Structures are given as C-alpha cells and as structure tokens.
C-alpha cells in the first residue's frame, strides 16, 4: 500500500516560529533577514519525510480570503491574535522551500487548510493510499479512520502523538472520531471562538455523548434528561448544530490538483540551496549539499 503525508502548513509554521522566536530578536539586532520559521519548518518537514516511505505529499495553507465559515458566523476565530509580521514575511518563502523539497503546496480561497487536508485525505483513501496527517490542531482528529492517522504536536517541534482507530477512544475521552464535531457543538472551542452551549462543560458533554452518541439523539431523548439539563438545553439544538457544522472539516471540495500532482517530487537541490543561501541558513545548506 502506498502512503501519503498531509501537513497543516499554517499550524506547523506557527509552531516553528514560536518555538524559535528568540532568533527573531537576534535577527533584528543584527539586521539579518528573518529565517527562523523557514529553517525550522523545512527541517520539520524533512524529518517527517525520513520517518516513512511516502509516495504523496501535500502541504496546505489558509488564504487571506473569507471562508464560508466567516460568512455563516461573523465571530468565527475573531479572538485570535494577529499573526506577527515577522512570521508573515516568511510564509511565502516557507512555501517556496517546501515546493523545492518535493511537496505539492496548495491553498484555495473560501476554504481553510483543514478542508484541503480533509479533501485530500478522502481522495487518497479512495485510491487505497494510507494517510498520515500532521498538525497541532485537534479539529483534524475527526478525520481519523481505518486508513488515516493524525499526528499532533504536543511539545515544541519534535514530540508528536499519534491518533488512530486503535487508540482514539483512550486518548480522546472515550469518544469516536465522528463525535469530535458533536463534542465541539456542545462544549465549543475557544480557539475558534465557538461558544457551544452555555452550561455544558467538557465532562457533561462527554457524558452526554457517551450515553446518546449524537446531538440529534440527545435532543430526541430530551424528556429522559434531568430537569437541570433540560433547563440548560431547552431551545439550544440549533446552536449546537450550528457550532458542530462550523467545526466540521469538508472532505468533498473540488480540488485544484488531482492525486497525480500530489505525488512527491525529487528534491530540487539547486533551487533549495540557493534559497537557503539567500536567507543565511548555512547549517541546513551544508546538510542538503551533502545529499
């Protein structure tokens, strides 16, 4: 069976930047180009490529354009801090370096990087290709299935935790991947500014889903709930369904590139070395020059 690696570009670029943010101050002090995210992201992705024999490789990014989620819910992600300008200027170079490494780098207006990952994951598994997804975003856990594993960064840029069908319940509150969006519909998600239902915390949300399975089934059994829960949930099904929908990753968008274009390409060594030299990333330049 062939293997695909799908990477959440925004998520890992953020992690690469903030794991090495001290180097930004050094660059400012010495009037050097910002390169910490470029170097760290490139090294992370190179190491991931060495971890398994991958046949396909896709790295997805968000665009600046509003998504369908923004149009449905104006408060979506509204509390997130602005991306540091020192990272923003590195993102185009990060993308260029990853193309030189052999990845298909993609983005589509109207959708988030997660939606591209979800749609490429579905495309791969439909073609009997096993998928590894790398991110620090727990939203992607909903994509775990018999052919798809999700690896989340848990510490810095090196420590990863794998979620698969064998260990998922143990690592995610006893729930299933399909219940991730049900959980977010009830409990919410602060990182995306999804409030969930006021009065339903993680423990109560988990208990309800373990007993009833889905939001629809919880409300179908409304009369069996305690009076306290009935008071909390009264008239809230539309709210829960809205936040569940907003948390759902699309797996059926029309992709700009097909599976053939997602095949990993040979490293463009010359272009990569020129980029590393331009941005003063000498140690990596030396490493890749020896390949």
UniProtKB/Swiss-Prot annotation:
A GO term, aspect molecular function: DNA binding
The EC number(s) this enzyme carries: 3.1.11.-
UniProt keywords, alphabetically: DNA-binding, Exonuclease, Hydrolase, Nuclease
Keyword Nuclease listed: yes
Gene3D superfamilies (UniProt xref): 5' to 3' exonuclease, C-terminal subdomain, 5'-nuclease
Positions of transmembrane segments: none
Residue ranges annotated for the 5'-3' exonuclease domain, each copy included: 176-269
Top-level taxonomic group: Bacteria
Stored Pfam families: 5_3_exonuc (PF01367), 5_3_exonuc_N (PF02739)
GO BP term, pick one: DNA replication, Okazaki fragment processing
InterPro entries: 5-3_exonucl_a-hlix_arch_N, 5-3_exonuclease, 5-3_exonuclease_C_sf, DNA_polI_H3TH, FEN, HhH2, PIN-like_dom_sf
UniProt keyword Mitochondrion present: no
Protein purpose: 5'-3' exonuclease acting preferentially on double-stranded DNA.
UniProt-recorded name of the protein: 5'-3' exonuclease
Source organism of this protein record: Mycoplasma pneumoniae (strain ATCC 29342 / M129 / Subtype 1) (Mycoplasmoides pneumoniae)
């Amino acid at each position: 069976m062939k293997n695909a690696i799908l990477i959440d570009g925004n998520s890992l670029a953020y992690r690469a930047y903030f794991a090495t943010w001290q180097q930004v101050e050094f660059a400012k002090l010495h009037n050097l180009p910002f390169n910490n995210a470029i170097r760290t992201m490139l090294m992370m992705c190179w190491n991931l490529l060495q971890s398994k024999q991958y046949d396909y490789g896709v790295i997805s990014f968000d665009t600046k354009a509003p998504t369908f989620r923004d149009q449905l819910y104006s408060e979506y992600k509204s509390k997130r801090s602005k991306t540091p300008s020192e990272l923003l200027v590195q993102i185009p170079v990060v993308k260029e370096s990853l193309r030189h490494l052999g990845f298909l780098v993609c983005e589509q207006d109207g959708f988030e990087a997660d939606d591209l990952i979800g749609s490429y994951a579905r495309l791969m598994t439909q073609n009997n290709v096993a998928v590894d997804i790398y991110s620090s975003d727990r939203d992607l856990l909903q994509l775990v299935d018999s052919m798809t594993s999700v690896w989340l960064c848990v510490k810095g840029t090196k420590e990863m935790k794998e979620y698969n069908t064998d260990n998922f319940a143990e690592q995610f509150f006893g729930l299933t991947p399909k219940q991730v969006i049900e959980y977010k519909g009830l409990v919410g998600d602060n990182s995306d500014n999804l409030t969930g239902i006021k009065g339903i915390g993680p423990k109560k949300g988990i208990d309800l889903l373990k007993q009833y399975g889905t939001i629809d089934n919880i409300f179908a059994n409304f009369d069996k709930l305690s009076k306290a829960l009935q008071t909390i949930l009264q008239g809230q099904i539309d709210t829960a369904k809205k936040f569940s929908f907003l948390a759902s990753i699309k797996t059926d968008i029309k992709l700009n590139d097909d599976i053939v274009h997602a095949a990993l390409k040979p490293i463009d060594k010359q272009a990569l070395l020129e980029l590393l030299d331009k941005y003063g990333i000498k140690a990596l330049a030396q490493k890749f020059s020896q390949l």
